Amino acid sequence: MWIFYFPAVISVLIVTLYFYFTRTFNYWKKRNVRGPEPVVFFGNLKDSALRKKNMGVVMEELYNMFPEEKVIGIYRMTSPCLLVRDLEVIKHIMIKDFEVFSDRGLEFSKEGLGQNLFHADGDTWRTLRNRFTPIFTSGKLKNMFYLMNEGADNFIDHVSKECEKHQEFEIHTLLQTYTMSTISSCAFGVSYDTISDKLDTLAIVDKIISEPSYAIELDMMYPGLLPKLNLSIFPSVVHKFFKNLVNTIVTQRNGKPSGRNDFMDLILELRQMGEITSNKYGNNMSTLEITESVMCAQAFVFYIAGYETSATTMAYLTYQLALNPDIQNKLIAEIDEAIKANGGKVTYDTVKDMKYLNKVFDETLRMYSIVEPLQRKAIRDYKLPGTDVVIEKDTVVLISPRGIHYDPKYYDNPKQFNPERFFAEEVGKRHPCAYLPFGLGQRNCIGMRFGRLQSLLCITKLLSKFRLEPSKNTDRNLQVEPYRFIIGPKGGIRLNIVPRKDVS
C-alpha cells in the first residue's frame, strides 16, 4: 500500500527542501539591494563549490556584474552576504569603523589549529596580534636577514647546478624550495636539510593546505556548522605535522628561548609566561592560556604566510619579467648598480631601497592578489555610510581585491603589467583602498613585510646571475587553478632560466 504514497512523500520532501534552501532569497530584495539571482542549494557560489572556478575569480565576476552599485547582495548557500564595491565604504569597514568589523567570521572549531592569528576573532585575536606584532618590526627583520641571505645563496647555488642540466623550470615548484628554506630557518630555527626526512609528509601537508577540502565549502555555505560539529577545515595530518614540528623544536631548545630571536623564540617566551593578556575594548583585560594547541596554531599560520604565498607571488613576478624583457632589463640595471654601490654585497638596506624592484613587486600583487576574498563580520547592526543599507549583526561582508585591481576606473589598461603605476605621483592619485593585496587596517596581513623582504631578496639574487625567458611551453594566457585556496596558476609556470653572459 505504501507504494501509492511514495511519490507523494518524495514530492513533499522535494518541495520542503526547495523552500528550505530558498527561504532567505528575498533578503536583499526586501532591503532594495541589487544582486544576481541565487541558485538553489548553492546561492551565488555554484562554480566555486563545484570547483569550476576559483573563489577569487567568482568574486571578481560578481563585482563586475553591477558596476554602478556600491554594494551587491549575494548568498553563500542560504546565508546573505554583502559584496562591497565602493572604496569609501570599504575604508569605513576596514579602518574608520573597524571596531564593528574586527572579526573575520571564519567559524570552525577552536581546538587544534583554529586559534591562530589569521582565523581567530574577538579577544583571542587582539591578544595574539598584540603579542606577535613585534616579531615583524624592521629591527627584527633586519636581524633575520642573514638567515634569509644564506637561504638565497643556497638557492642560487641550486639553480646554477640545475642550469647545467637544463634551462626550463616549473618556476613555482623551484621557488618553493627557497621559501621552505627561509621559513624553516627564520621561523623554526632549522635548516631545510634537517627536516629532509619529513619532506614526504610536508608534501602531503602542502597539498592539503593549498587545495581546500569540502570542509571549507561547508564553512562558506553553512556558517557556524563546523564549530557545532567540532570540526576543522584542516585534516588531522596537518595538526599532527605541526604538533610534531613544534614539540621537536621545544625539546631541542630545552623549552627555553635560544637567543636566535626567531619566531619559535617568541613562542617559547610566551610559553614561559603561561598566559598572555591584552586590553579588550572597554579597558577590560583579555587573557589567553598558551597551550600546546595555541603554539602549534601560530606555527601553522606563520608557515602559511611565509611559504606558499611568497612562492606564488614570485612565480607570477618572474613570469611577467620573462614576458616583458624591457622591464626585466631596467630591473637588472637597478640591481647591478645597487650591488656595485654596496661593494658587491646584498644587504637589508640594498633590497629595501631599490625603488623599481619594489614597484615591480607591487604591480605583481595588483595583477595577482593571492588570497581572496577579504572577509569581515559585523559584530552589531551597522548603517553603511552614503547608503540606506543596514547590515545586521553577524552578516558577513566580502571585498574583492581582484575586482578592484582590474577595475579600469582605478587602473588604465588593468590587464597590462606596468610597474610605473606605483610611482609616488601615481599612487597619490588613487584612493588608498584601490590597492588591497594585504588587506587594510588592523587586520591586514601581519607578515607582509616578511613576505616582501624574502621575495625581493630572492629576485635580487636571481637576476644578479640569470635572465628569465619564455620557454616553448610557457602559457601566455595563464588561467587560475579552480580548486586551490591560494590563487595559483593552473598547470604551473614554465620558464627558461639562462645564466647571464655579462657576469662571472
UniProtKB/Swiss-Prot annotation:
Q: Provide the topology term for how it sits in the membrane.
A: Peripheral membrane protein
InterPro entries in the record:
Cyt_P450, Cyt_P450_CS, Cyt_P450_E_grp-I, Cyt_P450_sf, Insect_CytP450_Detox
- What domain of life does the UniProt record list for this protein's source? Eukaryota
Cite the binding residues for heme: 445
Q: Could you tell me which Pfam families the record lists for this protein?
A: p450 (PF00067)
Q: GO MF annotations for this entry? A: heme binding; iron ion binding; oxidoreductase activity, acting on paired donors, with incorporation or reduction of molecular oxygen, reduced flavin or flavoprotein as one donor, and incorporation of one atom of oxygen
CDD domains annotated for this entry? CYP6-like (cd11056)
Query: Any idea which UniProt keywords this protein has?
Result: Endoplasmic reticulum, Heme, Iron, Membrane, Metal-binding, Microsome, Monooxygenase, Oxidoreductase
> Does the record carry Hydrolase as a key word?
no
Instruction: Please state the Enzyme Commission number of this protein.
Output: 1.14.14.1
The record, for Gene3D superfamilies, names: Cytochrome P450
The UniProt entry lists the main location of this chain as endoplasmic reticulum
Q: For this UniProt entry, what's an example GO CC term?
A: endoplasmic reticulum membrane
Compartments annotated for it: namely: Endoplasmic reticulum membrane; Microsome membrane
User: What does induction of this protein depend on?
Assistant: By phenobarbital and the insecticide permethrin.
Q: Which reaction does it catalyse?
A: an organic molecule + reduced [NADPH--hemoprotein reductase] + O2 = an alcohol + oxidized [NADPH--hemoprotein reductase] + H2O + H(+)
Name the cofactor(s).
heme
In the UniProt record, does the keyword Membrane occur? yes
Q: By its UniProt entry, which PANTHER family does this protein fall under?
A: CYTOCHROME P450, CYTOCHROME P450 6A16, ISOFORM B-RELATED
Name the protein family.
Belongs to the cytochrome P450 family.
Q: What is this protein called?
A: Cytochrome P450 6B2
Please report the organism this UniProt entry assigns to the protein: Helicoverpa armigera (Cotton bollworm)
Q: Which gene codes for it?
A: CYP6B2
